[in-house]
Each structure stands twice: as structure tokens, then as C-alpha cells.
Swiss-Prot record:
Coiled coil: none annotated. This is L-lactate dehydrogenase B chain. Pathway: Fermentation; pyruvate fermentation to lactate; (S)-lactate from pyruvate: step 1/1. The active site is at H193 (proton acceptor). The keyword NAD applies. It catalyses: (S)-lactate + NAD(+) = pyruvate + NADH + H(+). HAMAP family: Lactate_dehydrog. NAD(+) binds at residues 29-57, 99, 138. Its main location: cytoplasm. Keywords: Cytoplasm, NAD, Oxidoreductase.
Length: 333
């Protein structure tokens, strides 16, 4: 006797097709789920996979999202601790790792996270050899370098979320002070995500009007208007949010979805993300730092050569030296 399904539906082809825009999120903590939800709300993926080592939490998050399927445009949401669930992903977002502690420098997190990545990265590449890896775990620049080394993927397909969020914070804070929307203030934070990030005051502008021409001292100690406080707030803001609510997640989730959209839709938009910078601005070591990168469906397509001041280049080199000082001592890469 035919089943209800057999009576209702006449199949015309065999089996489901491979997903075209599958996204996997590794780590279902606060940041991972903020990334997942932000990507779902932007309708970027035709399949979302979640991977974590904590099975109950993983299953619970998957079920919770599946129950909202009516309100989403992503037809398939799956999860498993086995990385085979991530097979055929276009983008894999890595948020796994030990959490940033209140008052802890991002750089102190490195060694605690490297050993975790030794298990994660080879598994991702095994099942999705053609994917673009987007690293979010902190300290993101060093861990993006670690991911590149462990993955064996070309450098343009290993990207760190970098200063995309720092720049967004900077644009928000500067725009608030100017009474305009953050999208109307153009400013870049480059270098290391976090403590030694580099504000490019020489390029800060509104509607093409360079702020440094209006105030030659902007961003310096000589500036009577103290605009440099905006960058100070960018550096301190993550620590402040962690102090207040215990973690940061929503802004980074939105930032990662923004990157995912550019990658999936082949938009060729420019984002400040962490990429291999050896040979640029006089940097001689293999380090990942944020520069303005043109992103498309192949990953980092190119890097924009910004006209930086000598001081800004010096700060960028200092960032590189700081990171290399840690990277050179890492084992088993």
C-alpha cells in the first residue's frame, strides 16, 4: 500500500543535489551562534552546518534553529561533532577556542588555542578542500596564521575576521561624534585586531573631505579636540563589553555575516581583514595582519595599497613584530 508521501509526491530526479552555498560554523558558543544567526538572517546559505564537541549543546542549538525554519530561507540546518557534517562547505567559520578572560590580552590566548586548532583544521580541509576558511577565534591574527600553516590551503583562502569589527566600531564612534550615520564616515583600522591596532587618521574622511586637512593634529597628542579617544575606545570597547555582559558576540556575528555575504555573492567589496602581509610595507616575516582586501568568491582577490604616513607604517611594522615574536616560538606547525 502506498504511503501518504508516495501518494502526495511524484519524484522526478534521484536524491538531493549538493549544496551550492553551504556554510559551516565550528563552535556553537556565544560568538558561533551569533555568526550562525546573522548568516541565516541575511539569507546567504542554502545549508548551515554546526560543529562542536559538546553534543547536548550542539543538538539543542540545531533543534532551536530548525524549529524556526518557517521564518528562514535556509532549507537545511544540520549539526554533528563529526566533521563529515561539514562536507562540501563553501565557507567555514571557525569560532572554536577557549574564551577570552576579563582583562586578558588577546595575545595570551595563543598557546591555549593552538592545540585545539591542530584537531579542527585538518578535519575541515579533509571534508571541504575547496572551502574558504574565515577565522574568528582570538587572538585572530596569530590563529589565522596557525590555520594557514595547518590547512595547507593557499593564503588567499585563509582569512581572519581581523579589524573588520574594529573599523566598524571606529566608524560608529566617529560618526556618533559627528552626528552622522556610521556608513557616511570613512575610516580604517588596520594591523592587529585589538591592542596594537592602527588607526589610519590620514585617510579619515566624510564625503571626500579629509579630516586631517581640517585638523592637521587629529589623532595625535597635540589634538585639542582629543579625537584619538575614539581609537582608544575602539581598543577598550571589547574589554568593556566583556566586563558588562561577560562576552562579546552580536557585533562580531554581524561583522562575519558581512564578510560571508561579500564572499558568497562575489561582490568584490573591500574589507579590512587579516591576510598574509609578508613583503608589504617593509614587513619581512610571515604574519597575518589586517589590510584593505578586495574579497570575492575566491577569497582575498587583492590588497589595496593605502597611502600611509611614516608613523602609520611604523605602527604596522610594530604590530607585525609583536605577532612574530609569538609565532616564532609556536611548536608543531
Amino acid at each position: 500500500m502506498a504511503s501518504v508521501m508516495q501518494k502526495l509526491i511524484t519524484p522526478l530526479c534521484s536524491g538531493p543535489q549538493r549544496p551550492r552555498n553551504k556554510v559551516t560554523v565550528v563552535g556553537v558558543g556565544q560568538v558561533g551562534m551569533a555568526c550562525a544567526v546573522s548568516i541565516l538572517m541575511r539569507e546567504l546559505a542554502d545549508e548551515l552546518a554546526l560543529v562542536d564537541v559538546i553534543e547536548d549543546k550542539l543538538k539543542g542549538e540545531m533543534m532551536d534553529l530548525q524549529h524556526g525554519s518557517l521564518f528562514l530561507k535556509t532549507s537545511k540546518i544540520v549539526a554533528d561533532k563529526d566533521y563529515s557534517v561539514s562536507a562540501n562547505s563553501r565557507i567555514v567559520v571557525v569560532t572554536a577556542g577557549v574564551r577570552h578572560r576579563e582583562g586578558e590580552s588577546r595575545l595570551n590566548l595563543v598557546q591555549r588555542n593552538v592545540n585545539i586548532f591542530k584537531h579542527i583544521i585538518p578535519q575541515i580541509v579533509k571534508y571541504s578542500p575547496d572551502c574558504i576558511l574565515v577565522v574568528v577565534s582570538n587572538p585572530v591574527d596569530v590563529l589565522t596564521y596557525v590555520t594557514w600553516k595547518l590547512s595547507g590551503l593557499p593564503k588567499h583562502r585563509v582569512i581572519g575576521s581581523g579589524t573588520n569589527l574594529d573599523s566598524a566600531r571606529f566608524r560608529y564612534l566617529m560618526a556618533e561624534k559627528l552626528g552622522i550615520h556610521s556608513s557616511s564616515f570613512n575610516g580604517w583600522i588596520l594591523g592587529e585586531h585589538g591592542d596594537s591596532s592602527v588607526p589610519v587618521w590620514s585617510g579619515a574622511n566624510v564625503a571626500g573631505v579629509n579630516l586631517q586637512k581640517l585638523n592637521p593634529d587629529i589623532g595625535t597628542d597635540a589634538d585639542k579636540e582629543n579625537w584619538k579617544d575614539a581609537h582608544k575606545m575602539v581598543v577598550e570597547s571589547a574589554y568593556e563589553v566583556i566586563r558588562l555582559k561577560g562576552y562579546t558576540n552580536w557585533a562580531i556575528g554581524l561583522s562575519v555575516a558581512d564578510l560571508a555575504e561579500t564572499l558568497i555573492k562575489n561582490l568584490n567589496r573591500i574589507h579590512p581583514v587579516s591576510t598574509m602581509v609578508k613583503g608589504m610595507y617593509g614587513i619581512g616575516d610571515e604574519v597575518y595582519l589586517s589590510l584593505p582586501c578586495v574579497l570575492n568568491n575566491g577569497g582575498v582577490n587583492s590588497v589595496v595599497n593605502m597611502t600611509l604616513t611614516d608613523e602609520e607604517i611604523a605602527q604596522l611594522k610594530k604590530s607585525a613584530d609583536t605577532l612574530w615574536g609569538i609565532q616564532k616560538d609556536l611548536k608543531d606547525l
